[in-house]
Amino acid sequence: MNRSDQEAYLMLPIINELKQLGGQSTSKELKRNVVADDKLIQENVLTSFKKSLSTGRKYLPFNFPFNFAITNLVMAGMLERPKKGTLKLTKKARDFHGTGKELSDQVYEISLPEWYTRSEKNKKEKIALHQIKEVNKSELDIDDGLEEDN
């Protein structure tokens, strides 16, 4: 499975595991339980670190689809983050009883437009920041060209 397939697949186990845990859990506990209870997820995903070619830092590839699945579920109103590191089911998630495909379709219908909006906002902010840097640079160039009369 590619990353986006993993992300879509993880949504239902996340919801089901939170239901088993009483509707609320820490992210770490939830991740461990999802991996332990799902037969399609290899248990070594929580110990198989890779090294980033660009930074040299170690990371867990499983964290990417897991965290994006969580964020999409939050965007779709299925989960809440009452405090940092804690996830909580919403009524919408507690009432969901469909398939993984039905869940991911429902979630992506809401979250994909939100991702697009975020992306556009980030692009605009990046352009604005670049323009500010260019103005500041040109002001420095002008200042460097001025000679003081003594």
Range-by-range predicted roles:
Residues 94-139:
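Short, amphipathic alpha-helical interaction segments positioned at domain boundaries
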Residues 3-5, 35-66:
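Short, positively charged loop/turn segments that connect secondary-structure elements
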Residues 85-90:
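Minor-groove-contacting beta-hairpin "wing" of winged helix-turn-helix DNA-binding domains
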Residues 74-84:
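A short, conserved structural fragment
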Residues 70-71:
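Short, hydrophobic-biased segments on the C-terminal half of alpha helices
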Residues 2-28:
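Positively charged, polyanion-binding regions of nucleic-acid-associated proteins
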Residues 148-150:
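Acidic-basic catalytic patches of nuclease active cores, encompassing PD-(D/E)XK
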